[in-house]
From Swiss-Prot:
Locations listed in the record: Virion; Host nucleus
Family: Belongs to the influenza viruses nucleoprotein family.
An annotated GO cellular component: ribonucleoprotein complex
Function: Encapsidates the negative strand viral RNA, protecting it from nucleases. The encapsidated genomic RNA is termed the ribonucleoprotein (RNP) and serves as template for transcription and replication. The RNP needs to be localized in the host nucleus to start an infectious cycle, but is too large to diffuse through the nuclear pore complex. NP comprises at least 2 nuclear localization signals that are responsible for the active RNP import into the nucleus through cellular importin alpha/beta pathway.
Lineage: Viruses, Riboviria, Orthornavirae, Negarnaviricota, Polyploviricotina
Motif (Bipartite nuclear localization signal): 198-216
This protein's UniProt keywords: Capsid protein, Helical capsid protein, Host nucleus, Host-virus interaction, Ribonucleoprotein, RNA-binding, Viral nucleoprotein, Viral penetration into host nucleus, Virion, Virus entry into host cell
Keyword Metal-binding: no
UniProt-annotated stretches for the region Disordered: 1-22
Protein name per the record: Nucleoprotein
Free-text description of this protein's post-translational modifications in UniProt: Late in virus-infected cells, may be cleaved from a 56-kDa protein to a 53-kDa protein by a cellular caspase. This cleavage might be a marker for the onset of apoptosis in infected cells or have a specific function in virus host interaction.
Gene symbol of the encoding locus: NP
Amino acid sequence: MASQGTKRSYEQMETDGERQNANEIRASVGKMIGGIGRFYIQMCTELKLSDYEGRLIQNSLTIERMVLSAFDERRNKYLEEHPSAGKDPKKTGGPIYKRVDGKWMRELVLYDKEEIRRIWRQANNGDDATAGLTHMMIWHSNLNDTTYQRTRALVRTGMDPRMCSLMQGSTLPRRSGAAGAAVKGVGTMVMELIRMIKRGINDRNFWRGENGRKTRNAYERMCNILKGKFQTAAQRAMMDQVRESRNPGNAEIEDLIFLARSALILRGSVAHKSCLPACVYGPAVASGYDFEKEGYSLVGIDPFKLLQNSQVYSLIRPNENPAHKSQLVWMACNSAAFEDLRVSSFIRGTKVIPRGKLSTRGVQIASNENMDTMGSSTLELRSRYWAIRTRSGGNTNQQRASAGQISVQPTFSVQRNLPFDKPTIMAAFTGNAEGRTSDMRAEIIRMMEGAKPEEVSFQGRGVFELSDEKATNPIVPSFDMSNEGSYFFGDNAEEYDN
């Protein structure tokens, strides 16, 4: 990336930091993780959870959701102003699962948001610790990315369901800040912009008046975020054109869809962070580990080491396969929903299979599901190797396209080819004369046509033994070049419905 110098590292985004050196970053990320851990321990005490119940991922999700809801200023204000039946705007809660007489029971808990905010601040030295909240949002987003396919959302905005590899972070809330923007895929940003433009087309006042100015600022900011993800001059120039449009309409929507398609080959840079559930950080803090003193990174060996030594449990429905449930959560923890399955399998040390072949539903349990038949099992979240997370998108050469399979956005910096079905992708570009024909379009198509599926990305980069903390001896895996591995291919995953 040419503009690397002006960019803050994720860890800086994660902690709202000014420029910091590596140790300061590790310390501030560690501080954030420690705060989440302390909060989780306190909540387990409040809820009188046993050690086993505290390590249950479903309980972790409920507790995380409670604190996110307690700090959701906008929604809280909205709930105050639009009281709805049966919803107390001042309270938050959810299902907590406990083991009673050899059976799992569901208990609905309700807490004052004020009380939850107090516990959170207390665990974070009196601060609001927004970075920690964002971290939990990204963990939820990564879990959603792994669990659901966004076909319906893609089709609604006029995009192709095969573009699902561009949809990282599509369920992140708007308030997830710079760290959230960094992990959003090209398709996610395009979808947000298209929704905005459509509102403008349907509502005459959307861009007008005092509010319209704010809307316009948000539009241009989102355009700049998306522009920053593209790595070729032509794609960036097209984004300038979309941003500067006086009155965004269908031409801009067409341009954005064109750009999203182009990102299947000319991949954008999208950050990947290993965000783990709070029930992993809690026990680590409880055992006396000092994250701030030791330092922590979301993109190095630390999350792998932490998962290596963690016990996490999950509720299992009668006909679910515990190994498949483990894979789902492993992928979410490593932010690997859109990674090539060949690479994930190598790192994990067990075969990672496509979503459609998994016998498991999501991690969350609906309130109407029968608890009598519910079992639980240990999630296997360990890995054979570790690898550095990337945000380059794996293009082989900065200004040139590299082969991008129709469904991969690399997570790990590991050498591989990125096979893709070029005829399928290129077919999407023929005869689409809507929008504008321009030199930029021609240039983008030319670069895509030049891409070769057999080119190698991340040349010389490999995985590391877990004992190799300083990443000194890369092990470069060799993959079957013809056999691409995309997770959502030929798939029947559930849809994500808010």
